[in-house]
Amino acid sequence: MTAPCPPPPPDPQFVLRGTQSPVHALHFCEGAQAQGRPLLFSGSQSGLVHIWSLQTRRAVTTLDGHGGQCVTWLQTLPQGRQLLSQGRDLKLCLWDLAEGRSAVVDSVCLESVGFCRSSILAGGQPRWTLAVPGRGSDEVQILEMPSKTSVCALKPKADAKLGMPMCLRLWQADCSSRPLLLAGYEDGSVVLWDVSEQKVCSRIACHEEPVMDLDFDSQKARGISGSAGKALAVWSLDWQQALQVRGTHELTNPGIAEVTIRPDRKILATAGWDHRIRVFHWRTMQPLAVLAFHSAAVQCVAFTADGLLAAGSKDQRISLWSLYPRA
C-alpha cells in the first residue's frame, strides 16, 4: 500500500487589505488589545503605519510620521503604550499610543539609509537600550533611551571586511546584566558583540550572501539566519560565548526577508522572496508547511503569543494563519 498523501497546506484564516502599498514590517502587541486580542501593527512602503483589530479585521488607526518613506521596522515598548517605527527617511519615531493618542513624542535621527532594522532591549525599566545602524557603513550605534545618550559605536576592525550590518538582535542572558548583540553582515557573517566591552566575542561565516535576518532562542542558546542565498543556517552559542554553525537547510529558491521563532520555541516561519511562507519545526528543522498564498515577495512575518502567524507581502496584503496551535 502506498502511504497516504499529507494534507494540503491550509488557507489563511483571514486576510487584511487596505494598506494600498507593499507591507514591509509587522509587529503584534500583546500589551495593547482590542476585544481581548492583540493589536497588529503594519508598516508600508508608503510610510504609513496601520494598527489593525483582529476582531473587526479592520485598521483602527493610521499613523503618518515618515514623510512617505518606507517603514522598515516596528516595535512596541513593554505595556504597549509606546511604539517605535523606523523609516527610510532616516528617522526612528517614538509614538505615544496611551488612551487613544497617536502622536510622535520623540525621534532619533539615523546615520544610515541601509536595509538594517534596529533592535531594542527593554526589561520594563524606565531606561532601555537601542541598537541602530551607525554613521560608518560598517558601524552599529548603541543608545540609551529615552535620553538618546550615545553609549558606544561597535565598529569591526578594518581588516574584518564584514561590510554593512544587515540585521541586529540585542539580548541579555538570564544570569547576566551585560547586553549582547548578534549582528548579521553583508559578507554573510554572524557576529556576537559584547556591548559593554565594545568587542567581538565570536564570528562565524554562515552564508555566501548577505544575512537578511536572524532570530535567537536565548533559552536554547541557538539561533537561525536567512540570507539572499538559498540556505538557512542554524548556529549555537556555547558557555564561552563562541558561535558554532550547527547545520544548514537548503531552500528551493533564494532570498529570505525575515525569519521568526514562535514565542513557545516550537516552530519558526520564514518570509520568502519567492512569495512563499515556510514553516519548520525549530528543534529538528523538519519542514512542516509551505504556504503559497501571496502573489509577490513575502517581506515580513510575526507571531502572536498564542501562535497566530501574520505575513506581509509586496502584494499589499497581510495574511493571518492558524498553524499548529499551542497546546
From Swiss-Prot:
Please give the biological process terms from Gene Ontology that the record holds: DNA damage checkpoint signaling; DNA damage response; social behavior
Q: Does the keyword Cytoplasm apply?
A: yes
UniProt key word Cytoplasm: yes
Q: Which InterPro entries match?
A: WD40/YVTN_repeat-like_dom_sf (IPR015943), WD40_repeat_dom_sf (IPR036322), WD40_rpt (IPR001680)
Coarse class of the primary localization is cytoplasm
Which locations, inside or outside the cell, does it occupy? Answer: Cytoplasm; Nucleus
Q: What does this protein do?
A: Acts as a critical regulator of DNA damage response (DDR) signaling via specifically regulating phosphatidylinositol 3-kinase-related protein kinase (PIKK) family proteins.
**The name this protein goes by in its record:** Guanine nucleotide-binding protein subunit beta-like protein 1
Q: Which organism is it from?
A: Homo sapiens (Human)
Q: Lineage from the top down? A: Eukaryota, Metazoa, Chordata, Craniata, Vertebrata
